[in-house]
A protein has these predicted regions:
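Structural signature of the two symmetry-related core transmembrane helices
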Residues: 1, 204-219
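Helix-loop junctions at membrane interfaces in 12-TM secondary transporters
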Residues: 2-14, 221-233
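Intracellular juxtamembrane helix-capping segments at the cytosolic ends
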Residues: 24-37, 243-257
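Loop-to-transmembrane helix entry/capping segments in MFS-fold secondary transporters
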Residues: 39-49, 172-173, 258-268
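A membrane-interface helix-boundary motif in multi-pass transporters
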Residues: 66-95, 285-296
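Juxtamembrane intracellular "pre-TM" segments in multi-pass secondary transporters
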Residues: 109-144
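Short amphipathic helix-loop junctions that connect adjacent transmembrane helices
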Residues: 158-175
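Helix-to-loop junctions at the C-terminal end of transmembrane segments
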Residues: 189-202, 287
Length: 296
């Protein structure tokens, strides 16, 4: 792909394929949580998984920032005027993703037995029964709620950079630095959240995070006027956003029987994506008609 309008469709197709593969992989990845933890430490295990994901992204972002974004002359003879330095970054990320997936692939292949993990004869009826048995099951109610609040999380994660750039004038380099600090804060937040998940409950963690995130987003969109205010606002959001993701996975794991983990996490992924367009569409519409602040 090249940085002109002729490659928009091609880029979207590639993005669709990569995102689809990621979502499918996450179904099986999430369904292994019960196998990797004990009943009394499932929150810490889930939190540690998310925490390592957040902190593990920091080195690659630093590498990207200081090798490809900030220098006037970048490696491999890449031409910054043609955005080749930016276009090269996904290749580095793809390699990073592959290399650090290998230990998990090798370990689970050798150490984990799958024979009691999944129903060998799934059917549409069995899938429906997970969420509906004459009325919504507890799992169905949770997935319905998650479908709503996950839309808000998608807007925060996907649209935060656009908002920071449009309202507070963040440059690409500043956005990357902000993301690095935010990921470190998220690492700490989700570790604490995972520990508290085992002490309290997933439901309490989720509700508290929703309350804090709602108040914080309101402050950042309607009150914050300076970059400093916005920076601390992002830090608070980062601290809690990982905890709600981790607690959601734990709650789903506890709601499902072992044989339903594959089907259940398929629905879990589906519920997070089926209305994924709604949040960005609403924000985009309000932003277009009024302002970015009201949109957020």
């Amino acid at each position: 792909a090249k940085p002109n309008s002729n490659y928009i469709l091609f880029t979207l197709v590639i993005f669709f394929i990569s995102n689809y593969c990621y979502e499918v992989a996450s179904i099986f990845y999430n369904s292994l949580l019960k196998k990797c933890s004990n009943e009394n430490d499932i929150g810490k295990t889930s939190g540690l998984g998310f925490a390592l994901g957040y902190i593990g992204s920091v080195p690659i972002m630093l590498l990207t920032l200081y090798l490809f974004v900030l220098p006037e002359t970048v490696p491999f003879g890449l031409d910054k005027s043609k955005f080749e330095n930016i276009r090269f970054v996904p290749l580095v990320v793809a390699l990073w993703f592959l290399v650090f997936s290998l230990p998990m692939i090798y370990y689970f292949k050798k150490k984990i037995s799958y024979e009691d993990n999944f129903d060998s004869s799934p059917s549409f009826k069995k899938i429906i029964e997970i969420i509906w048995k004459n009325k919504f099951t507890s799992t169905g109610k949770f997935l319905l709620a998650r479908m709503i609040y996950s839309d808000a999380l998608i807007v925060l994660i996907a649209g935060g950079g656009v908002y920071a750039s449009g309202v507070f004038g963040y440059t690409p380099g500043e956005l990357l630095k902000l993301a690095i600090v935010a990921n470190v804060v998220a690492f700490l937040g989700v570790l604490i959240g995972g520990y508290l998940n085992d002490k309290l409950s997933s439901k309490k963690i989720i509700l508290f995070c929703i309350l804090v995130l709602t108040a914080t987003v309101f402050y950042g969109s309607m009150i914050a006027q300076t970059k400093t205010e916005f920076f601390y606002n992002v830090m608070v959001i980062s601290f809690f956003i990982g905890s709600i993701q981790s607690a959601s996975r734990v709650m789903m794991t506890k709601l499902l029987e072992t044989k339903d983990l594959g089907k259940g996490f398929g629905l879990f992924s589906f519920s997070g994506r089926i209305t994924a367009f709604a949040g960005p569409l609403l924000v985009g519409t309000v932003t277009y008609l009024y302002s970015q602040r009201l949109g957020l």
